């Protein structure tokens, strides 16, 4: 059998290649590219001697590239060899760079990824050199096109080298990759590590910023002084304005008079026969000077005039006000005790007088007292006592109650007690009329209660149980009480 040429081998179909391999005694159950390579080695062993260190992938890539170039030249190719698409290696856009040039350009860049790229480019250079050796028996027009493609690839290589140099210069600024993982290196920096703050220092800094209590109190006092001073100034201005208004309204001689009247209100002066200084004109009292806002606190402002002038004559019976114990008529009024304030009165003399009437009689003169009618307790002033128009304008100062028994000249004298005179006077209470209750019933039966208590004291740990006899006695008593009540209701007698 004649050995086919290389071009004939490449133009055969896969089935024909298998038949050829079987006839040659080779393994036919292989892929197309490997089967073609095995046939070439079998029929042309010198091609193997020329490239002893060539890998199996070189011939495959050569055939792929040749077929691709033939397809570009002739859309309808003569070869009937079926090729597996997508399995072959695609040529890289950035072609190979010599290792020495790259190392010289990127000096100081010792990254593992760059070294692996250099190894890959070296392998590709080896493949290209082998492709050139294999493609010697191809036609001249193919060689021409190949040379053109190589020229374009060289231009591309020069461009890529420039780009790589630029990238290498940029990479040199980036630190070299070490064995530390990606994010662990950042944690080793002192600034980036989140550390717990020193709270003691923080608290001290805040405490220094704080204000001391003494300074705070000083500042508070200053603020209060400023506010109070402004208020005092306003008060002083209002007082001055009020004084100026009063000075404009009243003459200078009248301004000094109210001072005396104010003093007389506090402590009354002794009486004189002339115009008493304790009396002040009514018009003066009603002036703006004596308004409620300007009155002294010490003066009794209320118009209260005490009816009781002695503490011994105070009424302490509250049943009249509360209307309690109305059925006890005898207890509402009790005989008044004998007081030193009452005068001794004979049977033919006047009836009893109150303390107020006695006081008023003392104020009157002796000849006026003689002219008074006998049976009138109230005082009617005589024409000699009537006040003049100038005295009527003057008002009496209010009486100050000192809670002391007032002493008059007549009450100081102790008179002898007259029994007939006191009996002749009417009673000041309602006496009891009717039969009195027997004395024994009102008394409490203390003996029974005492005996009962003594029994309880003696037997406090053993309580007395009610026996059958005691219960029978109690039942008999209850029946007797019911019988008596029924009889009383039948006869119309109320039974308690």
From Swiss-Prot:
Molecular-function GO terms, alphabetical: DNA binding; microtubule binding
Low complexity compositional bias, start-end: 261-281, 447-459
The entry's keywords: Cell cycle, Cell division, Cytoplasm, Cytoskeleton, DNA-binding, Meiosis, Microtubule, Mitosis, Nucleus
Biased composition (Polar residues): 56-69, 150-159, 376-396, 403-423
Region feature (Disordered): 44-206, 250-294, 338-496
Cellular component terms (Gene Ontology): cytoplasm; microtubule; mitotic spindle; nucleolus
BP terms from Gene Ontology: establishment of mitotic spindle localization; meiotic cell cycle; mitotic chromosome condensation; mitotic cytokinesis
Protein name (record): Nucleolar and spindle-associated protein 1-B
Organism: Xenopus laevis
Phylogenetic lineage: Eukaryota, Metazoa, Chordata, Craniata, Vertebrata
